[in-house]
Every structure is written in structure tokens, then in C-alpha cells.
């Protein structure tokens, strides 16, 4: 029997399946809950049937700091790389959440900012969330994608009503991060832009 091996730059040729923490925990998610959920996926046999992804949703985000001004986790996710390494060690993959907006749905820091160094904080945003629900003039997709790759993440949920320019920036940032990371668009990617979503993401949610 002839075996044909094809090599290309396309990932996620079949729909990824797994677990996302938002419906269960919303903003109460933390490192211990993620690890417990990963363990449960293995213990219940789901991993052996193709369930591969353990995805952290909104509320992991802390502040931007360090030489790359990349977004860092808050106190709920100490040693985030160690957590990802553990998820990988039990045969699963790890996913993370972000948004092109200054602030996420839950009021945490996004991938853009109104200040050059991305100085917004959760406490500041929470006072008037509606003031931060826009795409800021300063963009940090490259910084954040590089950091996600260094932590070892395999999947990114990119949230809120998508526009092509923001999607293009994150798509290319992930492709140039040095790691294969699936880009999932959520939520309400306008259907009339479907050709762009096909070109610039691995999966998308229309509305």
C-alpha cells in the first residue's frame, strides 16, 4: 500500500474539539480549575476520543510590562508556562483568549491600547467599561503572539465583533511567532466578509 506524506503550512485540517472555561466558570476561572478540568478530560476518556484542547477564556489577563510590553497573567495564573507544560505532559493542548479591543467583554486588558505602553488596568477599565470597548491606536498583537508562543499555547480565541484589519494583524503575528497556534474568531464575524475569515483564520463564528 502506498503512503503519501504531504507537507504544508496549513494547520487545523479537522475541527479542533475540547473544553473552554467560560460557560462553567466565566471570570472565576483560575489555574487550579484549568488543571482540574484537564485532568478530568483525561480521566473521563475524552482525550482518547479526540478531545484535545483546554482553553482559558476571558479574565486571565493582568498588565503589560517587561521589555516586550507583552500582556502578562494576573494573580490567578501564576506560573502560566508551568501550567501549559503540564497540560502538554498529559497529551492535551492549551488555548488562550484575547480581543483586539482595549478591554475585553469582562473588562480585562486587550491587544490594543489608548496609551503607547498599554497602561490600562482591570481596576481602571471596570469603572467605565464602555469607554474601553473599541480598538485603540496602539497595537500589541506581535508582542502578545510572541509571548503566547513562548508560553507554549496552541490556540487563541479572538473575541468581539471582528474587523479585517485586526484579524490580519493577529493572523500574521501568530504565523510569525515561531509556533503553530490556531486562530479562532468569536464572536459575530460579519458573514459578508467570509472570504477574509477563510483567508485569515482557522475557524470563525459568524453573526
Mark where each language-model region is.
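Extracytoplasmic, non-cytosolic globular domains
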Residues: 152-156, 160-189
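Extracellular/periplasmic catalytic domains that process cell-envelope and extracellular macromolecules
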Residues: 9-14, 46-49, 87-89, 149-150, ...
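Aromatic-lined carbohydrate-binding/catalytic grooves of carbohydrate-active enzymes
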Residues: 37, 41-166
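Glycan-recognition surfaces
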Residues: 130-132, 140, 182-207
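An acidic-aromatic substrate-binding cleft motif
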Residues: 5-31
Amino acid at each position: 500500500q502506498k503512503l503519501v506524506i504531504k507537507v504544508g503550512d496549513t494547520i487545523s485540517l479537522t475541527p479542533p474539539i475540547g473544553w473552554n472555561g467560560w460557560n462553567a466558570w466565566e471570570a472565576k476561572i483560575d489555574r487550579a480549575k484549568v488543571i482540574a478540568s484537564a485532568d478530568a478530560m483525561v480521566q473521563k476518556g475524552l482525550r482518547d476520543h479526540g478531545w484535545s484542547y483546554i482553553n482559558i477564556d476571558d479574565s486571565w489577563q493582568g498588565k503589560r510590562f517587561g521589555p516586550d510590553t507583552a500582556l502578562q497573567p494576573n494573580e490567578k495564573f501564576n506560573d502560566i508556562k508551568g501550567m501549559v507544560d503540564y497540560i502538554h505532559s498529559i497529551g492535551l493542548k492549551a488555548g488562550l483568549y484575547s480581543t483586539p479591543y482595549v478591554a475585553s467583554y469582562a473588562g480585562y486588558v486587550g491587544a490594543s491600547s489608548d496609551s503607547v505602553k498599554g497602561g490600562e488596568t482591570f481596576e481602571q477599565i471596570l469603572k467605565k467599561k464602555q469607554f474601553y470597548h473599541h480598538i485603540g491606536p496602539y497595537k500589541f498583537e506581535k508582542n502578545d503572539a510572541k509571548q503566547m508562543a513562548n508560553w507554549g499555547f496552541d490556540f487563541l480565541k479572538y473575541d468581539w465583533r471582528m474587523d479585517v484589519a485586526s484579524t490580519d494583524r493577529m493572523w500574521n503575528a501568530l504565523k510569525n511567532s515561531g509556533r503553530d497556534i490556531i486562530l479562532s474568531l468569536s464572536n459575530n464575524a460579519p458573514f459578508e466578509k467570509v472570504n477574509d475569515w477563510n483567508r485569515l483564520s482557522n475557524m470563525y463564528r459568524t453573526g
